[in-house]
């Protein structure tokens, strides 16, 4: 059994802030935990514009707090998000998140991230193998 709190993750190597300071992700479960997925609490700053493309991962996102827009860049669709909204990037969609207020979300990645990934110039996490 694994039990962790965000308080014990804060300000450790599992607490990642983007280079531009727009988002912060607390990586609660990572690939090294060997459970087949990773689980993160992510906050995104109000008024920021954030483009992502998880070409190597499926991501499920549950919005806990905040409001904003999700733009599907592959299909030119705009979705209004609020507490209780969920989106699943099962088609590896390129997308943009534009928070109107600070957003706090819970995210699940498959395959799991290791915690060392950095978004490349296209917003993609590379696929990093988890050591056996």
From Swiss-Prot:
Catalyzes the circularization of gamma-N-acetyl-alpha,gamma-diaminobutyric acid (ADABA) to ectoine (1,4,5,6-tetrahydro-2-methyl-4-pyrimidine carboxylic acid), which is an excellent osmoprotectant. InterPro entries: Ectoine_synth (IPR010462), RmlC-like_jellyroll (IPR014710), RmlC_Cupin_sf (IPR011051). It catalyses: (2S)-4-acetamido-2-aminobutanoate = L-ectoine + H2O. GO terms for biological process: ectoine biosynthetic process. The gene is ectC. Keywords: Lyase. PANTHER family: L-ECTOINE SYNTHASE, PTHR39289. The keyword Lyase applies. Pathway: Amine and polyamine biosynthesis; ectoine biosynthesis; L-ectoine from L-aspartate 4-semialdehyde: step 3/3. It holds the Pfam family Ectoine_synth. It comes from the Bacteria. Belongs to the ectoine synthase family. GO terms for molecular function: ectoine synthase activity. This is L-ectoine synthase. Gene3D superfamilies: Jelly Rolls. Its EC number is 4.2.1.108.
């Amino acid at each position: 059994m694994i039990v962790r709190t965000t308080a014990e993750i804060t300000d450790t190597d599992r607490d990642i802030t983007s280079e531009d300071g727009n988002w912060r992700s607390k990586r609660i479960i990572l690939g090294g935990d060997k459970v087949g997925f990773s689980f993160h609490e992510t906050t995104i700053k109000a008024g920021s514009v954030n483009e992502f493309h998880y070409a190597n991962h499926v991501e499920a996102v549950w919005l806990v707090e905040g409001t904003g827009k999700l733009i599907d860049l592959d299909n030119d669709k705009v979705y209004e998000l609020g507490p209780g909204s969920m989106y699943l990037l099962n088609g590896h969609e390129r997308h943009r998140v534009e928070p109107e207020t600070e957003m706090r979300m819970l995210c699940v990645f498959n395959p799991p991230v290791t915690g060392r990934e950095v978004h490349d110039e296209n917003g993609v996490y590379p696929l990093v193998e988890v050591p056996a």
